[in-house]
């Protein structure tokens, strides 16, 4: 439970993130959850309802205790780092809007993240997935929605959040999709006919009327489709066909990148298609491709000694 004055500050902070910093709704929700977790811990730590004075005077021992609790609760290094970033962001907002001076929290460094290589699916697993995803949905328009969405992600390398933001306006250009990705960075993705045709077929039987600016992928009740709902459909597919455990909507984006690289795409082009700010992020796919080639060599090369 939060003091009403603090909740009002949080509401202003959220509006600031959306309107002035152009943060996505997904990021704002994640940041809000992280901040509330921090404030709930502060409630417990101080044994009383948090006030603005508690927030302003929070010391390094409290903050490190909160980070340690997250670690004990099995949060990943990435989640802990994001949580600290969220709280720091809130404190920066307080610096701009209240009398808060530079706070000790800005001296705390984020934990080092373990670099995990992206896991792609084999081309065979992708084919199986695309052929059978329509079997899950119960009604025709949902089945077609699932296939159209999965083909779109694999054919374009979109993040699930980007794919779910597609509107009718995106369909008006016959050659490319203009995507606003992480950090409000714009990129141009070529339309593949198979993806656009499936989306057109899906919209023809969608039982809900949509405006040009509304996301086209809908849930069964007509609301915007959530990533978790689509991933549940993929879990059913994965279990029934014995597909890899790492199969998720995001794994098809990884597969898009890895398969293009294996078929001769250059890193700079791939960086543009994926919307990576840094080429070093894209270079992770070269490591997975090398591992794939090593595996092929080990199992198939006739001279192994």
From Swiss-Prot:
It comes from the Bacteria. It holds the Pfam family Phage_integrase. One of its GO terms (molecular function) is tyrosine-based site-specific recombinase activity. It is found in: Cytoplasm. Disulfide bonds: none annotated. Residues 4-95 form the Core-binding (CB) domain. GO terms for cellular component: cytoplasm. The keyword Transmembrane helix does not apply. Residues 116-298 form the Tyr recombinase domain. PROSITE patterns: CB (PS51900), TYR_RECOMBINASE (PS51898). The active site is at residues 159, 182, 250, 253, 276, 285. GO terms for biological process: cell division; chromosome segregation; DNA transposition. InterPro entries: CB, DNA_brk_join_enz, Integrase-like_cat_sf, Integrase_catalytic, Integrase_recombinase_N, Integrase_SAM-like_N, Tyrosine_recombinase_XerC/XerD, Tyrosine_recombinase_XerCD. Keywords: Cell cycle, Cell division, Chromosome partition, Cytoplasm, DNA integration, DNA recombination, DNA-binding. Forms a cyclic heterotetrameric complex composed of two molecules of XerC and two molecules of XerD. Belongs to the 'phage' integrase family. XerC subfamily. Site-specific tyrosine recombinase, which acts by catalyzing the cutting and rejoining of the recombining DNA molecules. The XerC-XerD complex is essential to convert dimers of the bacterial chromosome into monomers to permit their segregation at cell division. It also contributes to the segregational stability of plasmids. This is Tyrosine recombinase XerC. The gene is xerC.
């Amino acid at each position: 439970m939060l003091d009403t004055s603090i909740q009002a500050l949080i509401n202003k902070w959220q509006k600031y993130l959306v309107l002035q910093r152009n943060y996505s709704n997904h990021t704002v929700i994640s940041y809000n959850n992280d901040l509330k977790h921090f404030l709930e811990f502060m409630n417990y730590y101080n044994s009383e309802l948090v006030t603005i004075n508690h927030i302003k005077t929070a010391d390094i021992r409290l903050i490190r205790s909160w980070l340690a609790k997250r670690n004990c609760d099995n949060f990943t290094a990435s989640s802990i780092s994001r949580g600290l970033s969220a709280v720091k962001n809130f404190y920066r907002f307080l610096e701009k809007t209240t009398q808060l001076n530079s706070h000790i929290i800005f001296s705390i460094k984020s934990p080092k993240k373990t670099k995990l290589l992206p896991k792609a699916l084999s081309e065979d697993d992708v084919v199986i997935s695309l052929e059978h995803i329509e079997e899950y949905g119960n009604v025709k328009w949902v089945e077609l929605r699932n296939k159209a969405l999965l083909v779109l992600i694999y054919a374009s390398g979109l993040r699930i959040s980007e794919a779910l933001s597609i509107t009718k306006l995106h369909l008006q250009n016959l050659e490319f999709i203009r995507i606003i990705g992480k950090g409000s960075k714009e990129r141009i993705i070529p339309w593949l006919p198979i993806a656009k045709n499936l989306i057109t077929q899906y919209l023809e039987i969608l039982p809900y009327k949509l405006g040009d600016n509304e996301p086209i992928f809908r849930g069964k009740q007509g609301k915007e489709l959530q990533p978790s709902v689509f991933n549940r459909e993929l879990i059913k597919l994965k279990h029934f066909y014995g597909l890899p455990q790492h199969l998720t909507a995001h794994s098809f984006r990884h597969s898009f990148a890895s398969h293009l690289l294996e078929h001769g795409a250059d890193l700079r082009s791939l960086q543009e298609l994926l919307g990576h700010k840094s080429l070093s992020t894209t270079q992770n796919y070269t490591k997975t491709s090398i591992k794939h080639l090593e595996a092929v060599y080990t199992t198939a090369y006739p001279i192994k000694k």
